[in-house]
Amino acid sequence: TYCAEIAHNVSTKKRKEIVERAAQLDIVVPTKLARAPSQEDE
């Protein structure tokens, strides 16, 4: 099992692409929701 960390300055759009690709490759991304907009505000 592999683990990846996404830098804090990566845009939300790119972060989403990275997380989707990591899921395909079975890579754990613990910081995947670090910059995701809150769903509670809607």
UniProtKB/Swiss-Prot annotation:
Ribonucleoprotein in keyword set: yes
GO molecular function: structural constituent of ribosome
InterPro entries per the UniProt record, alphabetical: Ribosomal_eL32, Ribosomal_eL32_sf
Family: Belongs to the eukaryotic ribosomal protein eL32 family.
Family matches, as SUPFAM superfamilies: Ribosomal protein L32e
This protein's name: Large ribosomal subunit protein eL32
A biological-process GO annotation: translation
Keywords, ordered alphabetically: Ribonucleoprotein, Ribosomal protein
Taxonomy, superkingdom: Eukaryota
Pfam families attached to this UniProt entry: Ribosomal_L32e
Gene Ontology CC terms: ribonucleoprotein complex; ribosome
